[in-house]
Amino acid sequence: MARYSVYRLKSGAMVLDCQADLLAGLPTRFSAPLLKSSDVPNPIARLHPSLKIVGERRIMVTNEAGAILVSEIAEEIASFADDDMAIANAFDMLLTGY
């Protein structure tokens, strides 16, 4: 598991892993759901970064982030390690308002 990797869950949903790699031994991962743009009617740019995954635009729904069981992860499909600032800024917005 790697921070800022996108995983497809067994349910078919996509999530962005946001947990520090140092905590890889835990049975859960802190992640944010990645929804289709059409499912997020009024995204807030800084809170909801837009990511292109396998040719499709997805919105990181930061305000719905939470823990998922590692056993629910089916496959890794992308990495956004190069977009770490936009992702970290989304959590800053959620937690501090800035």
Region locations from a protein language model:
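A near-ubiquitous, low-amplitude feature marking generic local secondary-structure context
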Residues: M1, S5, M14-D17, L34, ...
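Compact nucleic-acid interaction/catalytic patches
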Residues: R3-G12, L16-L47
